[in-house]
Regions:
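Residues on the lipid-exposed face of transmembrane beta-strands in outer-membrane beta-barrel proteins
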Residues: 32-36, 67-71, 106-110, 126, ...
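Short loop/turn motifs that connect adjacent beta-strands in outer-membrane beta-barrel proteins
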Residues: 37-43, 72-77, 113-119, 150-160, ...
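Outer-membrane beta-barrel transmembrane domain signature
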Residues: 119, 123-203
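Bacterial Sec-dependent N-terminal signal peptides
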Residues: 1-22, 229
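Membrane-embedded beta-strand positions of outer-membrane beta-barrel proteins
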Residues: 45-49, 80-82, 108, 122-124, ...
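Transmembrane beta-strands of outer-membrane beta-barrel pores
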Residues: 38, 49-55, 84-90, 112, ...
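Start-of-domain marker
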Residues: 20-83
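Residues that define the transmembrane beta-barrel architecture of outer-membrane proteins
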Residues: 24-30, 61-65, 100-104, 136-142, ...
Length: 229
């Protein structure tokens, strides 16, 4: 019943996003996250596929494909990732024009549990960005995630949980070529959502994310599947 309610909310929110016609209005992100730890090994892999739309469906904002190799030192409580991402960005409206980006990244993921039911995760990420028609750039990111089970103390099957995160982006270079500059602060994302643990390998989340830069702000509906392969 809880899972059916989750699906109903998904489609009601999607219908609402279709009614938006302005690029500053709420868009939608559809995301699939995957991870795998090799048996009896400190090595694994993880990644994500994301389709981001300006309005709901039919007007691509971004297509992001990202994956990396992971290493988890014994008894260290941290997971390191070396990965690559490819990003295609579209223009709002009728234009079919796109721009591309290749991105190498290094990441440290540190989980932490506070009390009986507060699941924190710290993510530190450093990116080397090769953006079309721009000079080489780097960027620093820090994300603090918090998941709080509502109907149990653990993120176990059938658990409904509150999901929050805040992510800060800082540019490593101000000069991006041809006399163009960006500011030190790149953007900030704040998210509030609800999740459902279907089984030990799969969980779903639905929520709303507000993204702000120095120039603009935009809300996004986010629908995600998290899969331990």
């Amino acid at each position: 019943m809880k899972f059916k309610l989750f699906i109903l909310v998904f489609f009601l929110a999607l219908n609402s996003s279709f009614s938006q016609v302005d690029e500053s209005q709420t868009g939608a992100w559809y995301m699939y996250f995957f991870s795998h730890q090799f048996k009896d090994s400190q090595w694994g892999f993880q990644g994500d596929f994301q389709y981001r739309d300006w309005q709901g469906l039919g007007d691509m904002e971004q297509l992001l494909l990202r994956s990396g190799i992971t290493f988890s030192p014994k008894d260290a409580g941290v997971k390191f990732t070396l990965g690559y991402g490819n990003v295609t960005t579209g223009q709002f409206g009728e234009s079919d024009e796109t721009s591309g980006e290749s991105r190498i990244y290094q990441e440290a993921l540190i989980p932490q549990k506070l009390g009986n039911r507060f699941y924190l995760t710290h993510r530190f990420r450093y990116e080397q960005r090769f953006v079309e028609n721009q000079d080489f750039r780097t960027r620093y990111r820090y994300n603090l995630f918090l998941n709080v089970p509502l109907n149990s103390k653990e993120l176990s099957p059938k658990a409904v949980y509150l999901a929050l995160y805040n992510e800060l982006f800082i540019n490593g270079q101000m000069d991006i070529g041809d006399g163009r500059e960006v500011q030190l602060f790149d953007r900030n994302r704040t998210y509030l959502g609800v999740g459902y643990v279907l089984n030990p390998k799969i969980r779903f989340q639905f929520g709303w994310m507000n993204q702000k830069t120095n120039a603009w702000g935009k809300g996004q509906l986010q629908f995600s599947m998290h899969h331990n392969i």
